[in-house]
Each structure stands twice: as structure tokens, then as C-alpha cells.
Amino acid sequence: DIDHIAKTVADVIKISKATGGLGVSVTKLRATGSRLATSNTTSTGPTPFAKIMDTAIRAIQRGGKKKGALCFYMENWHYDFPDFIDWKHNAGDDYLRMRTANTAAYISDEFMKRAKKGEIWYMFDPKETPDLVELYGAAFSKRYAEYIEMAERGEMKLWKKMPADQMLRQILVALQGTSHPWLTWKDSMNLRALNNNTGTIHMSNLCTEIA
């Protein structure tokens, strides 16, 4: 929803001005190429919207003393996660890089199990899989497997796959080269949360203390 995105950008600016550090989840943003029914066009994906916030925290300094601080979180089943891994790379198109904000991968136990076993990892458009972001633990694994079956039957419009251990290597290579993305753990954070009856935790804070 474009209004929600615009409000998030405004909130980032206001909180940064008030010296706050932020964590922002971009997992719910549509995938690149996702069909927009209202305009009969396709989405540009999370990167351009993240770039707006990245630029904003550089422009709006915290208390006028130092640059704003923000960390973007994305779950690695998102269709654009391979691009997310590259957000902090020094090389490449500056429009596709985050020069001020940090990045953190929000990883499920299901992914780590698949990486350990050498299995395949699937990535989806959150528009087609809106409940995945709200699920964790066994419920996530069950629903994720259902979406995989749907994709292989040709019932999903936008999806791709790769070996899970290959994705893990890409994350670790980027982490070694750029110190990003940080690794945070969706299942651990939600299963151990004292208030997990109030809803799903979609991210950590700026410095990932609760991860």
C-alpha cells in the first residue's frame, strides 16, 4: 500500500530527527515484477523504497549532530532477497546500494535445516504469500511447503529457487566483505518472546539486541 509506505518514510524522518535509531522490515513489500492491478504495471520491488529511507536518514541528522541510523530487515524467502544481499556492496549502481543504512537477514530454522541437508530454497512474492511473514516455527514450515507445492504445480506467478547452502554461502561472503547482512533469527526471537500472544515480531531493532 503506497500510503503505508509513504507514512513509513515520514516516520523514519521524524524519528531520526528526534535522535532515534530504527529497525524497518521490508519483507512485506512486493517483489520486483509483481503485477499492480490498479495501474496495470509491475512493481519495482523493495530497493527503490529502501533507497528513499536510506537517503532520508543521511539528510535528516539525529539531533543535528550525526547521521541517522537504520537497519533494514528482510526474510530470505522474499523474491528479492538475492538483491538484498548486495545492498551494502561497495561496487555497483549506487541507486541499488544503501550507503547509510545497515541490513540484516531475518532467517528461519526451516532455511537452516534445508541448508544443512543440501535442499532447495524457494523465494516468493509476498503479495502471493502474505501469511508467511506472520508465521514462524512449525506453522511456517508447513505453510512454506504448501507454497512450494503450489509453485511446482504452476499456481504461483512469481517465484524462483536455488540450493539453500548456496544462498547461505552468498550471505556469508557478503558478510565477510561488507559486514552485512547481519544474521538474525525469526524463530528464536518469536518463540522466546514474552509477549508473543500479541503478534509476530517481524524484525529486531537498530542494533539487533533482541536477536
Residue positions per predicted region:
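Active-site cavity-forming subdomains of large catalytic enzyme subunits
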Residues: 1-211
